[in-house]
């Protein structure tokens, strides 16, 4: 079984999309092994999006992600990384396939409702960043 990190961003939480997104996760057969709603500390956001540090949008991205609660989710299942990314759809909702979370709910590339790890390495790093020892179900 593979694990991945998923997140409902502040725009999704603010718009009350958490129950719908969790239902979609359940309906796809993924197991939620960790879940927490939280205000993301700025330091955590800067670590999480560290690869974008030199990009012009970095400050705005950190401000957005720390500007409201997020839902951090640890998912487990067969091909969880690729499967969750397929469920999310393309980063730009205009390019997202019909029926994906972003096609259905995102309003822009910046406010695209969800995040998902893009590799086993980033999944491991992101899960460790958001969940401490003993916080994930075995």
Swiss-Prot record:
Gene3D superfamilies: Nucleoside diphosphate kinase-like domain (3.30.70.141). It is an enzyme of class 2 (transferase). It comes from the Bacteria. Its cofactor is Mg(2+). ATP binds at residues 9, 57, 85, 91, 102, 112. Coiled coil: none annotated. GO terms for molecular function: ATP binding; metal ion binding; nucleoside diphosphate kinase activity. It catalyses: a 2'-deoxyribonucleoside 5'-diphosphate + ATP = a 2'-deoxyribonucleoside 5'-triphosphate + ADP; a ribonucleoside 5'-diphosphate + ATP = a ribonucleoside 5'-triphosphate + ADP. One of its GO terms (biological process) is UTP biosynthetic process. Its EC number is 2.7.4.6. Major role in the synthesis of nucleoside triphosphates other than ATP. The ATP gamma phosphate is transferred to the NDP beta phosphate via a ping-pong mechanism, using a phosphorylated active-site intermediate. This is Nucleoside diphosphate kinase. The gene is ndk.
């Amino acid at each position: 079984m593979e694990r991945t990190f998923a997140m409902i961003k502040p725009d999704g939480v603010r718009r009350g999309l958490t129950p719908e997104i969790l239902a979609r996760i359940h309906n796809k057969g993924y197991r939620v092994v960790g879940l927490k709603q939280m205000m993301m500390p700025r330091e955590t956001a800067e670590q999480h999006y560290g690869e974008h540090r030199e990009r012009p949008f970095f400050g705005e991205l950190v401000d957005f992600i720390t500007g409201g609660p997020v839902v951090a989710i640890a998912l487990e299942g067969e091909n969880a990384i690729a499967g969750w990314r397929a469920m999310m759809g393309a980063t730009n909702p205009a390019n997202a396939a019909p029926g994906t979370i972003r096609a259905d709910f995102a309003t822009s590339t910046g406010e695209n409702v969800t995040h998902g790890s893009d590799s086993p390495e980033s999944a491991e790093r992101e899960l460790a960043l958001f969940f401490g020892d003993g916080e994930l179900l075995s």
